[in-house]
Amino acid sequence: MDLQAIVTDTWNALADERGGGTPARYIPALAAVDPCKFGIALATDDGQVACAGDADEKFSIQSISKVFALALALEREGSALWDAVGREPSGDAFNSIVQLEKEKGIPRNPFINSGAIVTTDRFIGRRGVDEAVRDLIDRLRRMGRNPQIDFDQDVARSESEAGERNRALAWFLADFGRLLNPVEEVLSVYFRQC
């Protein structure tokens, strides 16, 4: 199987779709991203890498980071994590406050914003924000086999400045006793991560 040919053919097949999406407008740094940028990179477990398009461009992984936060939280908490966050589809918006209130502060799953805030809190644990941030970056660099992976400080700042809804979710979680750490500490990691 010619992995590079598959990736290139896929990239070419999607040529007409480039620019069809809309970057998040509520986060100013993301609103400025060129929607025509499109790259594919595929890495196999035996070390093969195939790339096409804008694959060498740095980009913000946004909610993809929630998978890595969940992995770190599960390593620290084990199955006890599922007492703090569910494993069910939400059926509501990714940033719903109403559902969080109805569910008494237990997010439906770790991939909606309230659930990701809880998993971020749990991978921070009691060790502190700086160590948690280093742990997450180290994990992303190892798994991506790329020592250049880092947080985009402009996007993090922009997320924080436009983060009223996520602050509301975090304060709801804190009010229900679901966070171990102060809200602003959890959000300082969450905004860098996501």
Give, region by region, the residue ranges found by the protein language model.
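Active-site-adjacent helix/loop patches that line small-molecule binding or acyl-intermediate pockets
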Residues: 1-19, 75-182, 188-189
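A short, well-structured edge-of-sheet supersecondary motif
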Residues: 15-52
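Generic structural signal for well-ordered secondary structure
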Residues: 33-35, 42-43, 61-67, 112
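Acidic-glycine-rich active-site phosphate/pyrophosphate-binding loop
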Residues: 36-49, 173-187
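Active-site SXXK
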Residues: 46-47, 60-82
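A short acidic/small-residue loop/turn micro-motif
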Residues: 56-58
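Long, repeat-rich segments with strong aromatic
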Residues: 193-194
